[in-house]
């Protein structure tokens, strides 16, 4: 019976520094997949609060705010689905973020792929709480979970949220996704599943997009932010992205594209860190007065309500949370045609999909929407309907439930 199933969710949250730009950009220090993994930690901690098995959630350094949205809600859904739910924590702030109806379990912080104290702790938790499934969402979690479950009947489910290259010649991958003891892999996007299908049977993979609850933007709607000096009738484009030392985020192309736009009504608001060279590029072109680089802001999402467009100009990316946040605010989206990001937007219905690494394409797409405010508004409305229909927590948790039950029944 489902009630008798115990599930352990191992999540290693990246530490979040002061002044992160938005929910999208938490945990960026880890590279390409770090944004996605930190965001996915929210999804699974929230899912744990609603699925209902014994959940061990959030092994590693967590952040109260990061744990709080997707994580707490999903945890609630797991509980409602009749799983006995446990959530692990490493800091007091994380402990406080755990819902009252879920038992917290303290675990040591770890980042290495082999950490003996952590492995011992996981084995003890498995025995004490009769865990049947471990859901590990990054490489360190997965590796330590595989070591900890040796000699047990516990099934390990992994997660992949990035298209970073996998090399069979690199033996460390056999401590993770290429290990035959991984019972199933959850993939954030269809593109990721297709990439992994070169190494893993499609039957052992499930696409489970990260959910988003529009209610998470209530505070942003209640306390919206604006940029001083931008006229009320301006066409405002927002970009939420930490780009310092990350040229693949496409900020340079976005700035170059802005300099190609002659419409004086178009203003760009960038929130997040950036390289000095990009700032200088913004100041040295014809659109300098219309490019507003606000830096790191904890209230970054508060700049979305009431704006016209949210743009993701990345050359490569995962599945940006900023696009979900924009859709929840009924803001039209422009996204480059790259794996992951393009799955969020329906071209010509909720926004525009453009070729990557092209200032000209950026300028043309912004210009098209600036000249057609009715279409821009319609895109925003359609995006809102898409987020509340296709990216629900209920669908996300149901997919987890199905996979957990599937691996247990084998």
Question: Where is each model-derived feature located?
Answer:
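A conserved mid-protein helix/loop that constitutes part of the nucleotide-sugar donor-binding site
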Residues: 68, 245-260, 324, 360
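A short, well-ordered alpha-helix in the C-terminal region of glycosyltransferases
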Residues: 361, 368, 375-390, 396-405
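Conserved acidic donor-binding segment of nucleotide-sugar-dependent glycosyltransferases
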Residues: 347-348, 352-359, 368-374
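Short His-centered aromatic/hydrophobic patch
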Residues: 136-142, 160
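A conserved, positively charged/aromatic
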Residues: 156-183
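Aromatic "clamp/platform" in nucleotide-sugar-dependent glycosyltransferases that forms part
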Residues: 315
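Short hydrophobic beta-strand element within catalytic cores of glycosyltransferases
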Residues: 332-335, 345
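Nucleotide-activated donor-binding/catalytic signature segment of Leloir-type glycosyltransferases, i.e.
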Residues: 280-297
